């Protein structure tokens, strides 16, 4: 399975002047945790890191340091995530038919999740890793008043990996660019063009590091995993 990792995270919310994926998390950069999990997954045979030119030297040095068994390629990203993934799709090895897209900021994804997602692509053409929503969700109007309360039993929180056939995702990206569609994840592109996307069970701990609080929570989860592994 081919894996693309968009890795152009901003450090703005951290008050940092560098990519948040290069910030330290329990002794190594945030990105390192996602790379190591993908490397340990039995199904992942190639990894493409999609980043910005200013981060290339640091990220390539990180890959060298980790000494991963899985081949890793660097791919230059675009101005927005959507353009970056499109660049990544066009840079896949010749003959690639299926692809997983995984945000580098979701550094707690496990090898088991990557393998489960890879297996899902053998039975469905497109999916999103997701977990059921636990909180009650409120739809709010512009003036701050509650407009609606959706039925929680039908709501899922989308994560990554998200999986697709390369042909269908490339086609949707090209159509999206022509129509100037702006989406927040790749599954939304397929949805916009009427293509079915299924749900694959994600992981409750598969959070996205966006704020300093997320980084602190991620550290606690990793420490718990290390403790559990040590006493097993």
Swiss-Prot record:
Its EC number is 2.7.7.60. PROSITE patterns: ISPD. It is an enzyme of class 2 (transferase). It catalyses: 2-C-methyl-D-erythritol 4-phosphate + CTP + H(+) = 4-CDP-2-C-methyl-D-erythritol + diphosphate. Transmembrane segments: none annotated. InterPro entries: IspD, IspD/TarI, IspD/TarI_cytidylyltransf_bact, ISPD_synthase_CS, Nucleotide-diphossugar_trans. Pfam families: IspD. The record marks 13, 20 as: Transition state stabilizer. The keyword Nucleotidyltransferase applies. Keywords: Isoprene biosynthesis, Nucleotidyltransferase, Transferase. SUPFAM superfamilies: Nucleotide-diphospho-sugar transferases. GO terms for molecular function: 2-C-methyl-D-erythritol 4-phosphate cytidylyltransferase activity. Belongs to the IspD/TarI cytidylyltransferase family. IspD subfamily. Catalyzes the formation of 4-diphosphocytidyl-2-C-methyl-D-erythritol from CTP and 2-C-methyl-D-erythritol 4-phosphate (MEP). This is 2-C-methyl-D-erythritol 4-phosphate cytidylyltransferase. The gene is ispD.
């Amino acid at each position: 399975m081919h894996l693309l990792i968009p890795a152009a995270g901003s450090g703005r919310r951290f008050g940092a002047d560098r990519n948040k994926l290069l910030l330290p998390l329990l002794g190594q950069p945030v990105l390192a945790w996602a790379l190591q999990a993908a490397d340990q997954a039995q199904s992942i045979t190639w990894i493409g890191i999609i980043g910005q030119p200013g981060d290339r030297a640091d990220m390539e040095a990180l890959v060298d340091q980790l000494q991963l068994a899985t081949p890793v390629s660097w791919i230059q990203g675009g101005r927005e995530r959507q353009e970056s993934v499109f660049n990544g799709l066009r840079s896949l090895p010749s003959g690639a038919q299926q692809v997983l897209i995984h945000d580098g900021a979701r550094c707690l994804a496990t090898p088991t999740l990557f393998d489960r997602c890879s297996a899902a692509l053998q039975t469905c053409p497109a999916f999103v890793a997701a977990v059921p929503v636990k909180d009650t969700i409120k739809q709010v109007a512009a003036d701050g008043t509650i407009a609606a309360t959706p039925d929680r039993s039908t709501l899922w929180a989308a994560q990554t990996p998200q999986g697709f056939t390369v042909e269908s995702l490339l086609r949707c990206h090209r159509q999206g660019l022509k129509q100037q569609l702006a989406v927040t994840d790749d599954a939304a592109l397929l949805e916009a063009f009427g293509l079915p996307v299924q749900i694959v069970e994600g992981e409750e701990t598969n959070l996205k590091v966006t704020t300093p609080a997320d980084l602190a929570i991620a550290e606690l989860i990793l420490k718990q995993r290390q403790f559990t592994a040590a006493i097993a």
